[in-house]
Amino acid sequence: MIEQFHLGRDADCPWEADKDDPGVRWRQLVSGDRTPSCGITQGVCEVAPGSELAPHHHAPQEVYYAIEGRAEIYRHGAWHPIEKGDMAYIPGGTTHGLRNRGSEPFVLVWTFPTDTFAEIEYVDG
């Protein structure tokens, strides 16, 4: 993929979901198979109240940046609070997850150092 300036819109990035994590959905904002980019993949994830992104791991490192709401992030065998304005750096191979026990959606921006989102193989934690 050739790198070039790209300006995207929410309307161009449909919500996606996985039956294994009901109440969790995401948008791929930057991914080399959808945008003229390489070396970075980024999107937005929303965890509905009462929902959970089950603990999992994957080879690439990842960064979360919380932009709305409150939730709990799983790391080092325990759940810890995460809220709007918090950032989490997740080393590759580290088991992590999210759960929202609140009454409002929890929304974060995620980033991987990969060309495409399809390169990331999620493994149950």
Annotate the PLM regions.
Residues 34-38, 47-51, 70, 114-117:
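Short, charged/polar surface micro-motifs in flexible loops or helix N-caps
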Residues 44-48, 57-73, 111:
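Short, conserved beta-strand element in jelly-roll/cupin
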Residues 45, 89, 104-121:
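A short hydrophobic beta-strand segment most commonly corresponding to one strand
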Residues 49, 59-60, 78, 94-95, ...:
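A generic "binding-loop/recognition-motif" signal
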Residues 54-55, 73-74, 90, 96-102:
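Short beta-strand His + acidic residue motifs that chelate non-heme Fe in jelly-roll/DSBH
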Residues 77-92:
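Short acidic-glycine-tyrosine-enriched beta hairpin
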